[in-house]
Amino acid sequence: MTSFPHADLSLTEDQQKASDAFSDWLQQKDAGLPFVLSGYAGSGKTFLSMRLLRQVESSGLCWTVVAPTHKAVGVLRQALNLEGLQPTWYPSTIHRLLRLKLKRQGDRELCESTEQTAGALEHLGLVLIDEASMVDSSLLSIALQCAHPFKTRLVFVGDPAQLPPVGESESPVFAMNRAISACLREVVRHQGPVLQLASCLRDRRLPCELPPLLPPVHSDLGQVGVLNRSDWLSRAQEGLRQAAACDNPDAARILCYTNRRLEALVPHARRAIHGEMADQMAVLPGEVLITRTAVMAPASSDGGETGEEPDLVLGSNRELVVEDVSPERCDLAEFGVAGEAQLSLAGLGVPVIETLNAKVRSGELELNLRLQPPSGSQAREQLDALLKRLAQEARTAGKRGGRSLWRRYFLVRDAFASLGPAAVLTVHRSQGSSFGEVFVADDVFPRSLERLARDRQVFHQQLAYVAVSRARHGVYLVGDGHRNAASWSKALRGSV
């Protein structure tokens, strides 16, 4: 007889109440109301979700699980495999399940319904949506509309303390008035220093500001270190080096708040992983990259038909492995750019951008992508200047005359894939992922919380909580001074 992990573990009081509420909801004939399971890091959401899915399996319903990101889907697949559960439909992103079309708007992706969206849930009795805090209002509305005609039951699982979707003040899933809700408040996962730190930041037992320098706090369940900036960077580089040696990029990541800090940290991370070669080539074979924005069809020599959508080759936050790199001269004349005035203002004598073409792999998908020149390079400055000039011309032409000019602008912009090393991520991009060791940059923690407006205090609290709770084993912070050292030390040891 096959034994499953956690099979003999008893439920906490919170989990039992949630399980009972779910059972009652599952037996109701009216499936119109969704079920929302919320809980903080370590409260047992994944463990309980597997228990709930066993109930669904026993009921005979056709079911599947989805999440907003590919990384989060991978975590779900692993949990299902460990539990021996087999969904009716292969786990995927929610966008794929609902047959949504992704469109790029600036640096954001917007989802739109397609002809297949309305019938996407026709043969499914239940869908569990993990990492629900990342679901924005538009996506939530589409999911509810798709479920209604087929009486498909929707289960949302997420952490209300995480960052809300971009552009929204709160996660709309947890603000739904018409839903059956259950909340896991008791933290039951290993009470090591990592989870202790996350809990203390979430409930404000510790101030969300630059921490004091502390000796390492460690146990069999993990470690938290607060180091000066130099030691922190050295430790981060060593962690990345070891992760690369083990061919396990998820073993260590650096997380920061701003893109400016990310660009400053990337060279240090690349040197740690690739040595002297990092300074000689902007991209190297074997390097793990992440899509910083959606990659559109003009950036791929394979065309859009091999990607995720006809015009969109890859969504943002997709991790890729570089298999080969070659230089490329991108002739902008192919995109209608040849005017002397445009070229001279952009510092280009001829309509050519010197860049790289990378053969990349993501799972079974292989693509050849023209890369955006690296930040700070002459080619990048020329490209940015040209795009700025094209946008100015389009605005000056107005609505009637600017349509063709905007089309040319978007063709040039989308002709280059914006990729970056996955070793350094912003906290926002890290949501839905977990890593062995996490090195949190100092821009995540403000120096003085009291100087910030109330909404910014809440934001940094969520930011720090998400950063710390990405770690499975170890967290390393940048510290300064010794103020509040005693209270931090006690809190991390669970003495508060």
Please describe what each predicted stretch is.
Residues 107-121:
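Conserved alpha-helical scaffold flanking the Walker A/P-loop in AAA+ ATPase domains
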Residues 8-26:
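N-terminal pre-P-loop "Q-motif" helix
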Residues 18, 289, 320, 435-438:
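Generic structural signal for buried aliphatic residues
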Residues 1-9, 38:
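Conserved adenine-nucleotide phosphate-binding loops and their immediately adjacent elements
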Residues 34-38, 64, 253-255:
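Short hydrophobic/aromatic beta-strand immediately N-terminal to the Walker A/P-loop
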Residues 14, 20, 38-43, 47-51, ...:
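Conserved helicase motor core of SF1/SF2 NTP-dependent helicases
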Residues 22, 30, 160-382:
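Conserved helicase motor core of P-loop NTPases
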Residues 333-496:
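C-terminal accessory regions
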